[in-house]
Structures are given as structure tokens and as C-alpha cells.
Amino acid sequence: MIYEESKMNLEQERPFVCSAPGCSQRFPTEDHLMIHRHKHEMTLKFPSIKTDNMLSDQTPTPTRFLKNCEEVGLFSELDCSLEHEFRKAQEEESSKRNISMHNAVGGAMTGPGTHQLSSARLPNHDTNVVIQQAMPSPQSSSVITQAPSTNRQIGPVPGSLSSLLHLHNRQRQPMPASMPGTLPNPTMPGSSAVLMPMERQMSVNSSIMGMQGPNLSNPCASPQVQPMHSEAKMRLKAALTHHPAAMSNGNMNTMGHMMEMMGSRQDQTPHHHMHSHPHQHQTLPPHHPYPHQHQHPAHHPHPQPHHQQNHPHHHSHSHLHAHPAHHQTSPHPPLHTGNQAQVSPATQQMQPTQTIQPPQPTGGRRRRVVDEDPDERRRKFLERNRAAATRCRQKRKVWVMSLEKKAEELTQTNMQLQNEVSMLKNEVAQLKQLLLTHKDCPITAMQKESQGYLSPESSPPASPVPACSQQQVIQHNTITTSSSVSEVVGSSTLSQLTTHRTDLNPIL
């Protein structure tokens, strides 16, 4: 009973219980509980030792870091744009014949059916340009409707669209912030002159809107949007990450609808990203300020062969990067009827869309060059290292050879000096021996005495015989003394030579 009462009191005092597994602590306030949960989140969760005796090694090595990056998709996001563009360029080269066949089939169709040959694949930056053009327009959601077969005028252009276009193309002429409210009659021949500094954005947007045409005009095509909903979301997310400034004015629904239409059309026409159909300008949005972006009547199929003939001509001009204003300032002459004069500016607008495509294989080549650059740099670096090592070895070899030659010369001079020293030692020993033999010699003293005795002044009167005997004794004594002196001198010279040798040894 006491235990139950204490438990109830504890529950009343601390009503907040930790929900972590294996933890049943209680806390009086929610703040304490949040701090406790944060501690749980910060602790490492190792597996139980009973089930797994070996703890998993979670050391952050470079290999695991690269593996995690591959799992997340970091490297694929960096390289997907170049690979995708290069793949599209290859598909373009392999599907030229299919495009001509689809164009022939599209010539027999009228109305919304002609939009099925519109461009479906564009580079990532062009798609983002279209999103930037369409989003700031508050009327864009009301414009994407079924295209009627009559001509109509286009409304005023918002200032945010022109500012976005001006920011996107700074290298061209500046675009004013306000556009004319109404447009002239599209049936006039003078309206074929195209003066568009932002022709690339307009053409890309026209191709995208033409791509949306059949889905919007045909109610039966709307279920095709649902299977591509996830892909459209992915494309929308990628576009938002590249251009976060485009999220303005609350047009997320319009942009999502456009991306869904793009995703549905990409599966239907995957190989038509180079030859946009000339009739794609039927469903242009109202914020295009140029006179030829009107709706073309759907009951004129006779200009179709002419446009099919003009396709190779514009394809031949697709690589003219140095002349972007080839069809911008010069008016296109009227060909057969007023309708053909109205369609020809659309073909002129198609050319910048085509000029966007050729840099795709160059991007692939640039990537291959980037891939080859590290190997080339490493090869040159190794060559420089080898050359430097060779030069260093050569210098060291010359230095060692010079040292060896110098050592040989020094050894020869040392041997010569040693020979001279030994000769000088012998001479010194001989001279010392002579000095010792002749220093205080008794012979000289006896000779002096004998000479003194033999002289007539000092010699006695009668002593010849003892003198002779005395001379013999002196000679015998000198012989014995000389032998003894020579022995003494020899011993002394040997001792001196040994001492002198020890003195000369440090020099050697």
C-alpha cells in the first residue's frame, strides 16, 4: 500500500514520462523532458552485445565518406547535367530520320495535333528560363487554355517579366521595364520584322507552351499527367534548387503544372528536341510582347511543306554561335501568303532554340578534357621529376668523381711526404751519430798532447821509444773507445728515432 501511494504521488508530481525504450524517467515539467530527450538523441545507439559481440566500426574513413556520397547521389547530381546533355546530343544524331518521318506525319494533321512534334527536351538552364518567365506573370494560370482558331491580341506585359529577362540576358540590349499594351494586326506584312533582344527566351517559352498545347486542348490527354507526377516533382525540385529566386508571386501551382506537362510530353516525344514545329506559337502566354506571337489559325495546312523544307535550312544555321542576331534585325520577306509571312518569324524564333543545342557535345568534350587533364598533368609532373632526378644524379656523380680524384692526389702527396720524412730521419740519425763520435774525442786530445810533446820546445830530450809505445797504446785505446762510443751512439740514435717517429705519426 505504501509503495502504491508513493507511486501515485510520484505520478502526480512528475506527470511527464520519457517515451524512449528502456527509460521510464518522469519529470515535473515539459522542458525537463525535452532536455532529457535531447540527451537520448545525442547518445550513440550501439547494438546489444548479447546479439552481436562485435561492435560495428563507424570510423569516418574516406572510403565510407565517398560511399555515403554515392548513396546520397551527390556525384550524380554534379555530373548528370553534362551526361544528360551529351546523351541528348547522341540521341539527336541517331534520330534525325525519325524526326523527318514525324514531321511528315505532322504535316497531315491540323489543330492541336500539330503540337505533338514540338520540342520536348531542353537543357536545364533553358527550362529554368521558362520558369522565370512564366512565374512572375499573374495571368499565367488563366492563359493556359484551349487555343481557339481565331486571332486575338495579347495583353500587357508585367514589369517583373521584363526585369527577369533583362537579368538573364545582360550581354544583349537592355530591355525596358514596360512593354506596349496592345499589338498590331498580325495579318499585316510589316509585322514579319522581328526585333527581339530576348529572342532566345521567347523561343524557348514558345516551344514549352507549344508542348503544353495538345495536353490542354485535348481533354483526353489529361490522365497522362498523373503517371509522371513524381518525375514532375523531381524536375520541379531541381529547378527550384538552381533558381531559388524564381519562387515569387505565389505561382507555385502554375509552375508545377508546367513541369507536369513537360514530364508528360518528354515520354511521348523523347527525340524531338531539335526541330520544333512552326505551329507551336498557337498557345503562347499573354506576356510575350512581340507582334508575331499570336495564335495561328488551325485551318491552314498548306504552308506545311514549306516549313518542312525550311527545317534543314535552320538546322544548317544551328552552329552559328558567332552570329546570334542573324534573324533578329532583318525582316523576313513574305513568301506565298500572309499566313506564311506570319509563320516565318516563328521559324526565326526556332533558330535560337536550335543554337542552344550544339554546345551539348562540347560540354561532353570539355568533360573528357577535364578527365584527361589530371593524367596529363601527372605525366608531365613525373617527367619533370625524372629529369630533375637525372640532373641531380649527374651532379652528384661529378661531385663524387672529383672527390675521388682529389683523394687520390692527396694520397700520392702523402706517400711522397712520408718517403721524404723517412729519408730525412735517416740523415738526421747519421749526422747525430757523427756528432756523437767526434764530440770530445780523446784522439784529438791525445793528438794535441802528442803534438805538444813532440814539439821542439816542450818535448823532453830523450824519449823516442816510449813515445812509440805510447802512440800504439793510444791507437789501441782509440779503437776500443770508438767501438764503445759507436755502440752508445747507436743505442741513443735508436731511442731518438723512436721518439721522433712517435712525434711524426700524428702528421701521417
Curated annotation (Swiss-Prot):
Residues 403-431 are annotated as: Leucine-zipper. Binds DNA as a homodimer or as a heterodimer with JUN or ATF2/CREBP1. Residues 375-438 form the bZIP domain. GO terms for biological process: positive regulation of DNA-templated transcription; regulation of transcription by RNA polymerase II. Belongs to the bZIP family. This is Cyclic AMP-responsive element-binding protein 5. The lineage of its organism: Eukaryota, Metazoa, Chordata, Craniata, Vertebrata. The keyword Glycoprotein does not apply. One of its GO terms (molecular function) is sequence-specific double-stranded DNA binding.
